[in-house]
């Protein structure tokens, strides 16, 4: 299960490109039968008040609880054509950074209305909430949800505006060693909390790095999502002079929400800020 979640997260971070063109809905009628091909899209559908219109979801969709009982239509890379035909959706939401373009084209060729949703940045997530609200006829609820999400982030940003800068390494996976660049929503969250992503200058949404590069940049803090596992930082113990080791600043975030570009990232951002506050405290105590 943990390995599957890690693979799904890496797919999200890899930025596989799919076509953003949509088949127009000439009636402009709100969608009544929606399927989603990524767990975070199902979350957004519920967040904007359109949960009752959701009739099918992708593998690993587990939040909110209600999605666990819905039929599975595949994942970002495969489509259960038979199940999709049975469900007859009037809106198919796909993940722009995950589903391959040829799969999107095949869905459109079969006559399905497909909306390709971009969720690479925090701003993208807000836009996705509003767009899905419009498509499902829940504009007002979507605007409220988007506003609440933005307000949490704005509050955290203001709270940490004067915080002492702190160098952060975010570890997506251990083998291979993946991290995030400046364009990634995780890097945005680190910045909101007053941190500096040590690999913000790299190309690629989720670049691979080697151990030597991490040691050379000597982060004050190491963060990882729960999907990496309890042993996420075990290998780093070999270098006691690493700043994150000297300050005891290695934090495994409490759940997997940091890897999902959904409204629950507001909660994940609070966890990141809490970790960086604890890290600063550890550094003060050590000085």
Regions found by a protein language model. Give the residues of each.
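A ligand-binding cleft/hinge motif common to bilobed small-molecule-binding domains
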Residues: 98-109, 216, 221-238
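A short, structured surface patch at a secondary-structure boundary
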Residues: 33-87, 91-98, 102-103, 198, ...
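His/Asp/Glu-enriched short active-site or ligand-binding loop at hydrolase and phosphoryl-transfer sites
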Residues: 58, 183-206, 226, 251-252
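Short secondary-structure boundary segments
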Residues: 38, 96-97, 172, 202, ...
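Sec-dependent signal peptide recognition
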Residues: 2-7
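Short helices/loops that flank or line small-molecule/ion binding pockets
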Residues: 81-88, 110, 209-218
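C-terminal motif of bacterial Sec signal peptides marking the signal peptidase cleavage site
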Residues: 13-16
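Extracytoplasmic substrate-binding proteins
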Residues: 19-33, 90-91, 101-178, 199-201, ...
